[in-house]
């Protein structure tokens, strides 16, 4: 009832195995292809299996991206174990999604610091589209800087309602960054309706609102 037409649904894979499997996401997507778009997750400890799994999910199940959580693996995104997957994402034409910023669970936050870790990935893989979720707090200014600097680096606002966006993100969203920020809720943690209810407070014009809520995601994920 929140007026959401389509949602990206991500698998979750950590060192102990899948918390939400690619198979489960594929079932959901195949049952409701007009409503849901799949995002894969893989086992970083098995790099070639991970590449094969990503390729299979994109080519056979129509998944539109890869998502990994550096804090869950306790490996920053510039660790060599990610690099075969970045090459595969470029070849497959899908974005790499990750969490930046602090962690909610009691785990180290350092793996989510945008500079130097994510900047190094953007430098090493200029063709890789990167979608950085959870806005990067307490380093949101660093995340905005990277989104300004690199054509293929984007921010998604999952896990934050608009009333909690830092001023530098709101300024970026209203102005030069209107094509670089994607709306997200992080459901079930935050209902989309809660995030959408806060939207008027951002003071976005019609174009910025359309880009934020729809057009940027449609472009980045090839929807």
Where are the language model's segments positioned?
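Conserved, mostly hydrophobic/aromatic
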Residues: 25, 29, 57, 66, ...
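Short acidic/histidine-rich active-site segments
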Residues: 134, 156-158, 172-193
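Conserved beta-strand positions
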Residues: 9, 68, 98, 132-133, ...
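Histidine/acidic-residue-rich catalytic or RNA/ligand-binding cores of hydrolases
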Residues: 19-20, 108-116, 140-149, 165-172, ...
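His/Asp/Glu-enriched short active-site or ligand-binding loop at hydrolase and phosphoryl-transfer sites
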Residues: 153-164
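Mid-to-C-terminal alpha-helical segments outside catalytic/metal-binding sites
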Residues: 1-6, 55-56, 177-182, 190-223
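Active-site gating/metal-coordination segments in enzymes
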Residues: 5-6, 13-112, 149, 163
